[in-house]
UniProtKB/Swiss-Prot annotation:
It comes from Rhizobium meliloti (Ensifer meliloti). This is Hydantoin racemase. Inhibited by Cu(2+), Hg(2+), Pb(2+) and Zn(2+). The activity is twofold lower in the presence of Mn(2+), Co(2+) and Ni(2+). The insignificant effect of the metal chelating agent EDTA on the hydantoin racemase activity would indicate that it is not a metalloenzyme. Keywords: Amino-acid biosynthesis, Isomerase. One of its GO terms (biological process) is amino acid biosynthetic process.
Length: 241
């Protein structure tokens, strides 16, 4: 099976980090590749960044469809363009937020999410509600660190995350922690060992979920909601399924 990971932002080093996390957990017979658009924001921090990232991400999926990709992972915790991506792809499309939340609800009764900036908190709160986890998610927290700073100063990021995890355990009663940014994936194992609480990385969760769905023979339903887009002209261009 071939799983393609798409980082919707244009920072190639972040794409490489997410791919490294995926390669560590994939099945021996699974092929995982990765890419990112080159004309999208360097990081996705808010609704405007999300909107600007979606056309490039959909183009990556269309290219993957032509190459025979079986499933896709959208490696941004805001799950930008997830529903649109499922319209374009034949196989499963997994958002890392949805995957991480599903894992958290499966292995714990209550969990907290820790993300980068405070402006991302309401976006993630809405996603948690959409995914049916509002009763289980005790709090969405932020370490007030920009996404790109996770790579620029990983030691500081780790210190801030460790502190916030301990607060979440004490104040939220969190039994598991979800890392709310793909750029945190490389820190997951160390954070779990240091805090003694399950720490869930969405990239890992999404790759394993994609493998499970493909192994069971599931594809994206093309009945109504996720049917292929109708072909039509748009500003002189043809919108292709």
């Amino acid at each position: 099976m071939h799983i393609h990971l798409i980082n919707p932002n244009s920072t190639a080093s972040m794409t490489a980090q997410a791919l490294e996390s995926a390669l560590l957990v994939k099945h021996a017979h699974t092929h995982v590749s990765a890419s990112n658009p080159t004309d999208t924001p360097a990081s996705i921090e808010g609704g405007a960044d999300e909107a600007m990232s979606v056309p490039g991400m959909l183009a990556e999926i269309r290219q993957g469809e032509a190459q025979g990709v079986d499933a896709y992972v959208i490696a941004c915790f805001d799950d930008p363009g997830l529903h649109a991506a499922r319209e374009v792809a034949k196989g499963p499309v997994i958002g890392i937020c949805q995957a991480a939340v599903q894992v958290a609800m499966t292995i714990s009764r209550r969990f907290s999410v820790i993300t980068t900036l405070p402006r991302s908190v309401p976006i993630i709160e809405d996603l948690v509600s959409d995914y049916g986890a509002e009763r289980h998610c005790r709090k969405v927290r932020a370490i007030d660190l920009p996404v790109l700073a996770l790579e620029e100063d990983p030691q500081r990021a780790e210190r801030l995350l460790l502190k916030e995890i301990e607060i979440a355990k004490a104040e939220d009663g969190a039994e598991a922690i979800v890392l709310g940014c793909a750029g945190m994936s490389s820190l997951c194992d160390r954070l779990q060992k240091a805090t003694g609480v399950p720490v869930i990385d969405g990239v890992t969760a999404a790759v394993k979920m994609a493998e499970a769905l493909l192994g069971a023979g599931y594809a994206t339903s093309k009945v109504n909601t996720y049917a292929y887009p109708r072909i039509k002209a748009a500003a002189g261009h043809k919108v292709c399924a």
